[in-house]
Amino acid sequence: MTYDSEFGSHVSLYRDRIKQVIDDSLNEHLNSMILRVDLHDPIDTENMDNPFFQPRVDSGAISRFTSALKAKLKHDKHIKTQRKDWPDSRHSTLRYAWVREYTKNRKRHYHLILCFNQDAYYHLGDYDLNRNTLRTMITTAWYSALGIPIDSSGKLVNYPPNGKYLLNRKRDNFEQTYSDLMNRVDYMTKVRTKIVGDGDRNFGCSRG
């Protein structure tokens, strides 16, 4: 099943699944922060003279990313509870949805939404390898998934403008913010930038 918008045709199932991921986050975390993030593969000409630069750009990269990010969040919780920055009960279950797309020159990238407990994480922070900000954890998780050295630019991870949505069903602006987020989701579900039939998935999401 498909539906149409200004971006053309879309996959209805993807939209339904992404909506369920967002709703699952809200059901657990009254205050949820939803982020739009883009993950890019390194281009072929980057670091060709570096013998340690052997990126793992297989289909398992996206699963390695979510696993790496979960591990970083778990470690971050441990540190913050040890330092008494967080109460023991505070946590943030990572929920996510991703779509795989290709540019006209066949460069792979992923569009994602990442869902967090806003009481634990309410902003990205700067990309700083000396600090455990959310932006740093997300960015380094992708580099780890690719198996390449982390650099000071973090340029393979993009955070689109106005890509943070703060949701709380009790707030007056909930319906409008939720609608704005779902309009943003439409960009992820478009058909025209997906490749079908190559044996790899174009979509994935967390469950429950």
Curated annotation (Swiss-Prot):
Record family assignment: To E.coli YagK.
Name listed for the protein in its UniProt record: Uncharacterized protein YfjJ
